[in-house]
Amino acid sequence: MKEPAFWRTDGGRGSGALARALLAPLGWIHAWAVARRIRKATPVRIGPKVVCVGNLTVGGTGKTPVTQTLMQRLAEMDLTAASLSRGYGGREAGPLRIDPATHDASTVGDEPLLLARTGQAWIARDRAAGGRAIEAAGGVDLVLMDDGHQNPDLAKDCSIVVVDGLTGWGPGTIVPAGPLREPVATGLARADAVIVMMPDAATEPDWTGLGLSDLSIPVFHAWLEPLAPPPAGKLVAFAGIGRPEKFFDALRAAGGDIGEVAVYGDHHAFNAGDLRHLDALAAAHDAQLITTEKDWVRLPVDIQARVTAWPVRAVFANPGALDGLLRDVMDADMDAGGEAG
């Protein structure tokens, strides 16, 4: 789905304030349901440490690239990590270890398939069952739970909240009145660290505006950095992610010559009609098609060869502090039960 326009406005006449007000009671019910589920749950504790990379809003904040970077840094520390995702958009319920050679996005989801390119990746709609399956398979020091800050089923040793530094928490209203999954104060109270994703290294986060200046937990500044420059020549860029404009802006900032863009809903399943439309746009502009890695893995295999995937990675202003957080997680004594973060 595409985000309603009123999710990303600051209020005022004509900005969706009426829609938010009308939907606010449903948001309160949603927040109550989330809080009740967390309060009533008995989290399952597994042997490997569990670090959750989640957020407080619906839509793209950069969780998957952050998870990839964490997997890489853990590997550099001689630790074996496995990612655990719900598998949104895929048919398989799991628990299932992903094999990129045999699975595709329609079976396991796009984000888990992307994570499987970095390291061991699993899906499980039942996160506790997924954690047990990873533990039973053996050889894993730490599980990176991709999304799940509001899922209490698997006990966490560290909960990291990722937030888009430009859009922040939106207008502060809860789904369906806004992008929040739960109240900000409630979500941050369960967090052990926050990662603020900015457009680049030079753009400093508004710590005060985001309500992060007085937090007693680590707060990191990070951004997405392309692994290669955009292709030369005219481009037609398309994306079906939470915040497609971030992809288009990054392409332009890197020097990409975009003739036209095409926007699809998050996790969109591309069909023959979409591909004909994209081919027509490319022909009209004498351009090359380019998309995100996450979108590229959802394309039919016979189409992938003629579409460029533009990979990015999450880069941290203070990677040493990030490594320190991960070491602290590994060094911490395991509590007898319950949830650390």
Swiss-Prot record:
Keywords noted in UniProt: ATP-binding, Kinase, Lipid A biosynthesis, Lipid biosynthesis, Lipid metabolism, Nucleotide-binding, Transferase
Catalysed reactions, as listed in the record: a lipid A disaccharide + ATP = a lipid IVA + ADP + H(+)
Pathway entry: Glycolipid biosynthesis; lipid IV(A) biosynthesis; lipid IV(A) from (3R)-3-hydroxytetradecanoyl-[acyl-carrier-protein] and UDP-N-acetyl-alpha-D-glucosamine: step 6/6
Disulfide bonds: none
Residues that hold ATP according to the record: 57-64
GO biological process entries: lipid A biosynthetic process; lipopolysaccharide core region biosynthetic process
Known EC number: 2.7.1.130
Main EC class the enzyme belongs to: transferase
Entry GO terms, CC: plasma membrane
Recorded GO MF terms: ATP binding; tetraacyldisaccharide 4'-kinase activity
Physiological role: Transfers the gamma-phosphate of ATP to the 4'-position of a tetraacyldisaccharide 1-phosphate intermediate (termed DS-1-P) to form tetraacyldisaccharide 1,4'-bis-phosphate (lipid IVA).
Family per record: Belongs to the LpxK family.
Cited HAMAP family: LpxK
Protein name: Tetraacyldisaccharide 4'-kinase
Source organism of the structure: Maricaulis maris (strain MCS10) (Caulobacter maris)
